């Protein structure tokens, strides 16, 4: 406006941006609802632990330990939702059924849902409190959203994330998973330390810096 550009087109563009974002959010909410989770459950400040698991090295006892810890955490924290988009691999689904039973519906605050497309998953991750995962990529993505990541592996190929404090290793040890998730849910200082740690993968301003670079050329 200060440059003499008429205000109306700018405001029209701004309104379009808001409307576009609202439409995308509505679409993602609808996809999540069809997959088995109603995101509006979080409207009153309810917390969410997002879970993923698929690593081959965790098949067998590792997944049993993970699922047992998740089951006990969901019982311990009735005011927290636990959402697990299940990988299609039978080696992942079998231990889930062994621990939670054949019927995965009606488990209170535990929601096993079908796999999500990337945008819906990122949307769900943005609404989460903690991410509990054995994924490599999520260790890079979640810190950009300010989400602490507990990695259910004994090692990580993202040592920079470990060093910066955005991720912690818990392995598939029942007690470590229980203790670390409980600490982040109960201890605000511990949560803030992880969620506000410096993201080793950038501050989200790369696009702005690139634009500024070319503008100043």
Residue spans for each PLM region:
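A donor-sugar binding/catalytic signature common to diverse glycosyltransferases
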Residues: 122-162
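Amphipathic alpha-helical segments at domain termini/boundaries
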Residues: 8, 18, 53, 180, ...
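Short, acidic/turn-prone active-site loops that include or flank metal/cofactor-
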Residues: 115-117, 154-157, 173-174
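Leloir-type glycosyltransferase catalytic cores
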Residues: 23-29, 168-217
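Donor-nucleotide binding loops and adjacent catalytic segments primarily
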Residues: 19-127
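Hydrophobic/aromatic beta-strand patches that form the interior of the parallel beta-sheet core
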Residues: 83, 111-113, 130-132, 150, ...
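Single conserved hydrophobic/aromatic residue that forms the stacking wall/gate
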Residues: 1-9
């Amino acid at each position: 406006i200060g440059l003499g550009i008429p205000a109306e087109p700018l405001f029209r563009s701004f309104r379009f941006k808001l409307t576009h974002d609202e439409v995308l959010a509505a679409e993602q909410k609808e996809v999540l609802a069809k997959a088995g989770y109603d995101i509006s459950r979080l409207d009153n400040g309810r917390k969410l632990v997002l879970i993923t698991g698929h690593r081959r090295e965790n098949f067998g006892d590792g997944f049993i330990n993970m699922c047992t810890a998740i089951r006990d955490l969901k019982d311990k924290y009735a005011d927290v939702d636990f959402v697990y988009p299940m990988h299609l691999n039978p080696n992942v689904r079998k231990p889930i059924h062994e621990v939670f039973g054949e019927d995965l519906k009606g488990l209170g605050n535990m929601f096993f849902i079908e796999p999500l497309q990337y945008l819906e998953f990122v949307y769900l991750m943005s609404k989460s409190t903690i991410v509990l995962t054995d994924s490599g990529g999520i260790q890079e993505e979640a810190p950009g959203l300010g989400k602490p990541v507990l990695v259910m592996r004994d090692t990580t190929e993202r040592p920079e994330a470990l060093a910066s404090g955005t991720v912690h290793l818990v392995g598939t040890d029942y007690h470590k998973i229980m203790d670390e998730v409980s600490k982040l849910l109960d201890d605000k200082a511990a949560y803030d330390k992880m969620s506000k740690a410096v993201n080793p993968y950038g501050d989200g301003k790369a696009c702005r810096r690139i634009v500024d670079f070319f503008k100043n050329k």
